[in-house]
Swiss-Prot record:
Residues that span the membrane, as ranges: none
Gene Ontology MF: a single term: ATP binding
NCBIfam families tied to this protein: atpD
Lineage, broadest ranks: Bacteria, Pseudomonadati, Pseudomonadota, Betaproteobacteria, Burkholderiales
Signal peptide (from-to): none
Originating species: Burkholderia cenocepacia (strain ATCC BAA-245 / DSM 16553 / LMG 16656 / NCTC 13227 / J2315 / CF5610)
Locations listed in the record: Cell inner membrane
Gene name as annotated: atpD
Top class in the EC scheme: translocase
Keyword tRNA-binding (UniProt): no
Name by which UniProt lists this protein: ATP synthase subunit beta
EC number: 7.1.2.2
PANTHER family: ATP SYNTHASE (PTHR15184), ATP SYNTHASE SUBUNIT BETA, MITOCHONDRIAL (PTHR15184:SF71)
GO cellular component, one term: proton-transporting ATP synthase complex
Length: 464
């Protein structure tokens, strides 16, 4: 450690998670330098230089017991976390310290959590599809390998369950390494996830970084960067890595909490004025280069189910595929509650997914859109007033709607029905049969919570 690392300062003000520290004028810390409280492990991160030797910092940990006059040392470098294989199978906090009581992490390599995004000429876009085994996603909003996916939804519509199923289906089949960043989510979910990974013997391929709801805003603001730094290291070593974030909204919210304490004027709906920049800095780093790829799945909480809220609206622009979860569909008992008319993907292009897949997707969406338009008429006048073509459209749309539901492996404990993984070919074949009218004679309840179309035929026999 250099001599500058030993420069000491004194705390001059504490307001919640924001601490002001005074240093000698000729050796002020730089922005993002990590400061350590003398005699403890508490870390502060420099956010602003106020002049006269005073810097404003965010406390990455509880600020209980801090007072004016305490000594703080400057490490003269940003927060660095351990990276590489020793992090696999471990649970770490925002500073890369283990919190799973399984001993220290013996990694020789550390890396700063603040990195520049890769240069444009290093990027490597991919059109290779990533099969998830979830019918509605593979059909309507297919994922690309090395792409970015957002799961948007309000409270309680199934973002975390969908993400767990994706981890279950992709991470277990994938064989490569995964990084999971729990940003401001429930501790219970983090615990469940750890045991789920352990029971399915894939824990040795996953690095877990948690900054849960009960932690100070500084931790929640930086934990996504810690997880991303670990994923970037695997990518730069030439590996294909999966990066899961639950939940990006809490990252924004932590920024909002900190922003007000730093004395910035709030912007729309009380968010920080630097919302777009903070989101951009994070998202631009989650990308695939010529060395390796990062495929990321991010859960995005939508406050009050309003997709125009600045936080989800800012996230939309950075993603390759958006999976929108709808409360209306969840209220019908159809899970996963993905809205097939609102969800989109850049991969929906006949040159990428093939002519057959493209045409089936569009026909399914047209049928569902027609049903949506006719719903008001049906509510007022009933089905009898519709033309024969419209009656057929409605019947097929209701079958499609039910066929888009699917039992999940991770929900077996709650539902009692075994989870289903449906290959893409089977998904396309099933929906093709419905829109071509080959299933018109089957009752619509036969399509609810089944895997392939063959299961729907079997279920219909039992019903009849």
């Amino acid at each position: 450690m250099s001599t500058a690392a030993l420069v000491e300062g004194k705390i001059v003000q504490c307001i919640g998670a924001v601490i002001d520290v005074e240093f000698p004028r000729d050796s002020m810390p730089k922005i993002y330098d990590a400061l350590i409280l003398d005699g403890s492990e508490l870390t502060l991160e420099v956010q602003q230089q106020l002049g006269d030797g005073v810097v404003r910092t965010i406390c990455l940990g509880a600020s209980d017991g801090l007072r004016r006059g305490l000594t703080v040392k400057n490490t003269a470098k940003p927060i660095s976390v351990p990276v590489g294989k020793p992090t696999l199978g471990r649970i770490m906090d925002v500073l890369g310290r283990p919190i799973d009581e399984a001993g220290p992490i013996d990694s020789d390599v550390t890396r700063s959590i603040h990195q520049k995004a890769p240069a444009f000429d290093e990027l490597s876009p991919s059109t290779e599809l990533l099969e998830t085994g979830i019918k509605v996603i593979d059909l309507i909003c297919p994922f690309a390998k090395g792409g970015k996916v957002g799961l948007f939804g309000g409270a309680g519509v199934g973002k975390t369950v969908n993400m767990m199923e994706l981890i279950n289906n992709i991470a277990k089949e994938h064989g490569g390494y995964s990084v999971f960043a729990g940003v401001g989510e429930r501790t219970r979910e983090g615990n469940d996830f750890y045991h789920e990974m352990k029971d399915s013997n894939v824990l040795d391929k996953v690095a877990l970084v948690y900054g849960q709801m009960n932690e100070p805003p500084g931790n929640r603001l930086r934990v996504a960067l810690t997880g991303l730094t670990m994923a970037e290291h695997f990518r730069d070593e030439g590996l294909d890595v999966l990066f899961f974030v639950d939940n990006i909204y809490r990252f924004t919210l932590a920024g909002t909490e900190v922003s007000a304490l730093l004395g910035r004027m709030p912007s729309a709906v009380g968010y920080q004025p630097t919302l777009a920049e903070e989101m951009g800095k994070l998202q631009e780093r989650i990308t695939s280069t010529k060395k390796g790829s990062i495929t990321s799945v991010q859960a995005v909480y939508v406050p009050a189910d309003d997709l125009t809220d600045p936080s989800p609206a800012t996230t939309f622009g950075h993603l390759d595929a958006t999976v929108v979860l709808s409360r209306d569909i969840a209220s019908l008992g159809i899970y996963p509650a993905v809205d097939p008319l609102d969800s989109t993907s850049r991969q929906i292009d006949p040159n990428v997914i093939g002519e057959e897949h493209y045409s089936i997707t569009r026909r399914v969406q047209q049928t569902l859109q027609r049903y949506k338009e006719l719903r008001d008429i049906i509510a007022i006048l009933g089905m009898d007033e519709l033309s024969p073509e419209d009656k057929l459209s409605v019947a097929r749309a209701r079958k499609i709607q039910r066929f888009l539901s699917q039992p999940f492996h991770v929900a077996e404990v709650f539902t009692g029905s075994p989870g289903k993984y449906v290959p893409l070919k089977e998904t396309i074949r099933g929906f093709k049969m419905i829109v071509d009218g080959e299933c018109d004679h089957l009752p619509e309840q036969a399509f609810y919570m089944v895997g392939t179309i063959d299961e729907a035929f079997e279920k219909a026999k039992k019903i009849q």
